[in-house]
Amino acid sequence: MVDGIFWRIEPEPPPPPFPPPETILIPAGYHLGNVLLHAACVLAAFVLGRRLLGDPHAALLGALLFAVHPVHAENVAYIKGRTDLLAAFFLFLAWARLCRPARRFDVLTPLLFLAALLSREGSVIFFPVAFLTRWWHAGDGFREAFRRTLPLGALAVLFLAFYASLGPPAAYREGSFTPEGGWPALLLGLECLGTYIRLLCWPFSLTADYIGLETAPRDLVSVGLGVLALAVLCLIFVRLRRFLAPGRAMGRFVFAFACLALTLLPVSNLIPIKALLAERYLYFGSLPVLLWIGAWLAKRAPRASACALVLVLAVLSAARTLEWRAEKPLWGSCVRSLPWAWRAGLNLCNAHAEDSSLPATVRTRRALAAADLGLRANPAASELWHEKGYVLLLAGRPGDALPPLRKAHSLAPRDPQTRFLLIRSLALLASVQPAEARKAL
């Protein structure tokens, strides 16, 4: 993982006194930083587990599950996941301080929350989690819990107001996911909740990209898990309140999954969002669930069974990390796991097209096959038509590149790169087949 290559940066010479590009492009330091941050998050998770559970053995087991769970491989192996690691580290420390007895004035907790906000905008969701912790888990009254978490709420409101004044990020202005209303949105939300629960409890079908979920057929198993989770929570709230004390197993169960649901609210991704569902969103919210599982195993399961579970998760996490070492195995596994994930086909096409170790004909054939896989999942993806035309143009086939480039231009007429490739294809075709070029023009 430390010497993986999943890192891209434009090799332009930076101004002094920054290091030269050949130093910037060495990924070992970046990956090692992520590994160390993950280790720090595990230590902070152990401290938080001791405060929440009151049992060091259960907290240790929960922290170990958090450390080796394969759903966190994306956050650690992908350098871009550093934002989630930093935010989770500060939030775990703030959460642990919040579990301490009330003090007249606490400066460090708001500062830790501010550091998390500056690391990742989705940290604003910590405010309702903090309120739930004081009101439910710590047993404070409603007013006392609100008074204790008021500085966090004020920081969250000020940060959101400032962030909204800047406008949406440029990367999100186009191509963002826009949810439908009514029953389709409800089913999609239930499927997302069920998918997250399935990924935590059965991490055997992980993938790097879930874009395309909104257009794929509904997964009835995930929808059923989402419905079951909501039904159980509602039943417990309405009929079984006496079992919801923090010291009871049922109370810990509901508290853990309530915190998970809060962290997965749309506000945690600051709509409009680029990805409706992603494993990296689980890094912070998975901890209370894994702590609850650790507490249950510490009391009910033999020690050998708990150690075996940790070992199995560690093996799965190691295998998942190996996929993140390079793009072709990563996107290849994604295409095999989720045929509807059209962007995985696009990324696999890019990976094959840039693989200089293969002969040109083999490289072109594999790239086109990957693009066709993505187009079967989403024929309206202009990026796939663009990439297919680009691959054909690189292969010296401007005539074959014209149809996919025309299709890409019709789907995204404002894309300057597609226009450039279309003009380039026509120019190359004019030097070889003037009649065909005039007809195309």
Feature roles, as predicted:
Residues A367, A401, A437-A440:
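Single-residue signature of alpha-solenoid repeat helices
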Residues H409-S410, I423, A427, A440-L441:
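TPR/TPR-like (Sel1-like) alpha-helical repeat modules
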Residues S357-L358, L426-A437:
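Alpha-helical linker/edge segments of TPR/alpha-solenoid repeat scaffolds
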Residues R397, R406-S410:
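Tandem repeat domain/solenoid detector
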Residues N350, Y390, R424-S431:
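Residue-level recognition of tetratricopeptide repeat
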Residues M1-P359, R363-L394, Q417:
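Polytopic membrane enzymes that build or remodel cell-surface glycoconjugates and lipids
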